[in-house]
Amino acid sequence: MKKLTSALFIIFIIFSTKAFAADNEIIKRITEGEESAKITIIAYESLTCGHCANFHKDVYPELKKDFIDKGLVRIEFRHFPLDLAAFNASKIAQCNNDGSSSIMNTLYSGQTKWARGKTPEEATGYLKKFLEGENVNVNFEKCLSDKAIEDYVLNDRIDGVKKFEVNATPTIIINDKKFDKALNYKNLKKYLEKLI
């Protein structure tokens, strides 16, 4: 069932090539760090991806402490949903976005609680229940049906494929170059130190 859902989602994306709606100009990018940072990291992620959750648990806290909080690095989180559950979670994350990564961290830390279900509807139910349990204040149905946010999320994925040939998650782009080493903090730190 999951393979069928993923295949249907990919077909949906292929036929959704609309340009950004005018409203998208006011949708905030989920970021951390100073705009003036010398290094910009773009992280293409799917909220149902286990490796992405591991990045947020094992790599991101050190990256934030050593580079982002010191003004050396700015990170942008871009949506690359791999299935309908991730697509819906991305819409909720973007809708509830205050510009910081806190909603992403909440979704990744509780991923095993909500990223499950035999159907997209069941997974969406788990997502809603999880967010209610975490006291995340969001108009769930309105966010899921927001066309501007839907286009924004889909365009992140389309742009990732076109501009950087993203085909898996997480994919890390550093100053417009794909990071091709194993994604652990040691490798990332070594790479970033060469750019400072």
Show where each model-derived region lies.
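Extracytoplasmic thiol/disulfide redox context detector
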Residues: 2-83, 87, 149-163, 194-196
